[in-house]
Each structure stands twice: as structure tokens, then as C-alpha cells.
Amino acid sequence: MSKLAEIEALLFVAGEDGLKVHQLAEILSLPPTGVIQSLEKLAEQYEVNPDSSLTLLETSKTYKLVTKPEFAEILRAYSRAPINQSLSRAALETLSIIAYKQPITRVEIDDIRGVNSSGALAKLLAFELVREDGKKEVIGRPNLYVTTDYFLDYMGINHLDELPIVEETELVAEESQLFIERTDIDENQ
């Protein structure tokens, strides 16, 4: 497996947070100059490949995989699509965690789920089931996420206190199942 592929995989998993050169260097046991050379090569590969929708973005010394600007219109159309398509299990787990733990950061969601939740969170934001609600007052000031009024409407409740009470250990598995059942009911109506 090439270092280039490893960097690409790490950037993919890092999602919107991206990674800094020193983080990549530490994870891959490479010198920072080697990481920079690999990042430059990866960026060039994306730019010359007309069949790739991805590009490498560097902001504030943080590298991220993002879609090329020419795909903005189709991505906008996707984000505006009605929620008649089912949410993935990852999105449902993420939504249930936010509903019960809000306000909560993406990293806190990741810690509960045990995997990166960037993609699921992006979908929930696009569907307007959750929204950003300020920043947590810790180093890095990460965004805090909460559910929206649309979430309440979608779930058929008026207040968050109408959500079923669950034990902490049951939160991810049981509550995501409740959301799955709710979306199944909606699809069958």
C-alpha cells in the first residue's frame, strides 16, 4: 500500500476537519517534507484527472478532500432533495445521539459511535434535521450541534422531553432502532 493511498484514506476519514502535515507525519511515521511531497502529488493527480470529482484543499495549514467547484450545482440539488429517501443507519445513529445529548460536538458524537460521523452529520445538516448552535468553549472551539424544529415535526413530537427515556448504554443501538421504525412508518404511509 502506498503512502499516497494512506494519506488519501486518512484525509477521507478526517472529513471536514482535515489533517495538518504534522498529524499526517506522526500517523504515517514520515518526515513532514515527505508528507508535503505526497500531498502535492495527490493534489496534482486530482487536478489532472477529469474523471475525479475530488480535489485537495489547504486552508490554515489543514488539508481536506473536497469536491471540485464545478460540482457545486449538482451537490446543491442533492442537498435540497426532499427527505423521502431513507436515512442511513449512520445518520440515524448520529441523529439519535444529537437528540439525546445536545448540544454536542462532532468529536463527542464520534467518541460515542466509535467512528467518524462527518458524512452522516453533513446529511443531517443538509436535511435540516440538525443545525450548528454556537461553539464549545474548549481548545479549537468546535461547533455544537442541536436538533431543529423540523426534527420535532419529522418525529411527530412537540418537545424533546417527549423522546423515550433510555439508559446511556442503550442510546446508540436502541434509539437508532426507534428512528428506523419511525422512518419505516413514514415510508409506508
UniProtKB/Swiss-Prot annotation:
Main location: cytoplasm
Family matches, as InterPro entries: ScpB_csome_segregation (IPR005234), WH-like_DNA-bd_sf (IPR036388), WH_DNA-bd_sf (IPR036390)
One GO process term, biological-process aspect: chromosome separation
Keywords assigned by UniProt, alphabetized: Cell cycle, Cell division, Chromosome partition, Cytoplasm
A Pfam family: SMC_ScpB
Keyword presence, Cytoplasm: yes
Gene Ontology cellular component list: cytoplasm
Localization in the cell: Cytoplasm
Family: Belongs to the ScpB family.
Self-association state and partner proteins as the record states: Homodimer. Homodimerization may be required to stabilize the binding of ScpA to the Smc head domains. Component of a cohesin-like complex composed of ScpA, ScpB and the Smc homodimer, in which ScpA and ScpB bind to the head domain of Smc. The presence of the three proteins is required for the association of the complex with DNA.
Summary of the function given for this chain in its UniProt record: Participates in chromosomal partition during cell division. May act via the formation of a condensin-like complex containing Smc and ScpA that pull DNA away from mid-cell into both cell halves.
NCBIfam families attached to this UniProt entry: SMC-Scp complex subunit ScpB
Protein name according to UniProt: Segregation and condensation protein B
Organism: Streptococcus sanguinis (strain SK36)
Gene name per UniProt: scpB
